[in-house]
Amino acid sequence: MASDLEQLCSHINEKIGNIKRTLSLRNCGQEPTLKTILNKIGDEIIVVNELLNKLELEIQYQEQTNSSLKELFESLEEDYKDVEHLKENIPPHLPQVTVTQNFVNGSDLDPEEPVKVEEPAPTKKPPKEQRSIKEMPFITSDEFNGIPAYMKSRLTYCHINDVIKEINKAVVSKYKILHQPKKSMSSVARNLYHRFIDEETKETKGHYFVVEADIKEFTTLKVDKRFHGILNILRHCRRLSEVRGKGLTRYVIT
């Protein structure tokens, strides 16, 4: 019984001590000098939080770069192995490489050995020049940091560049069809070709653009609120502009 009473007293005293400490801290917060210090600490916490956000974005960018470099290294390593394999396993039916000299001394020639005259290789026709397709440049880390916070929301640097990559995919797919000879088109490509032509206007002449139907046709992107939010960011960064007409919004690559 006595031990229970002691435990109860100890518990009550602990609660009283907690209340006293709380009241003491509350009073400290009302003092002008301490209040100024607390406000400074709060401002510094906000600055540190912004720095941490920038650091997180930089880490994501470095990870993406590191991953790309790793893939490039693996690809080059495979190419090098293939070249070494071909070098060590040259088929016997291929002609051997002969070393020719521009100047030969008359004393070095064997008068009984006929001189071999090498015929010039036939000139190959230069390949037909392919028409280049304009693509949207990726957002840089400095540009991302300059985007207003209300536009970015929870979007990251990688999210925006992933969408740019898909938009470029749609642009390239569309204009490959437009540059393709009509005789070699399939029925599906021909239908798309006619749609592309119908969607052109005077404002889009000479420019590369896509519409939402192209995004759905050539990519796996969802044309939703998040997608349109990223389009607003791309307009802010001057990566694209909009041309409206005939019930369509055309996203022109700038």
Curated annotation (Swiss-Prot):
Subcellular location: Cytoplasm, Cytoskeleton, Spindle; Chromosome, Centromere, Kinetochore; Cytoplasm, Cytoskeleton, Microtubule organizing center, Centrosome
Region: Disordered, residue numbers: 105-131
Pfam family, one: SKA1
GO biological process: attachment of mitotic spindle microtubules to kinetochore; cell division; chromosome segregation; establishment of meiotic spindle orientation; mitotic cell cycle; mitotic metaphase chromosome alignment; mitotic sister chromatid segregation; negative regulation of mitotic spindle assembly checkpoint signaling
Region of interest called Binds microtubules and protein phosphatase PP1 subunit PPP1CA, as start-end residue ranges on this chain: 131-254
General function of this protein: Component of the SKA complex, a microtubule plus end-binding complex of the outer kinetochore that stabilizes spindle microtubule-kinetochore attachments, promotes alignment of chromosomes at the mitotic spindle equator (chromosome congression) and assists suppression of the spindle assembly checkpoint. Kinetochores, consisting of a centromere-associated inner segment and a microtubule-contacting outer segment, play a crucial role in chromosome segregation by mediating the physical connection between centromeric DNA and spindle microtubules.
Protein name: SKA complex subunit 1
Origin organism lineage: Eukaryota, Metazoa, Chordata, Craniata, Vertebrata
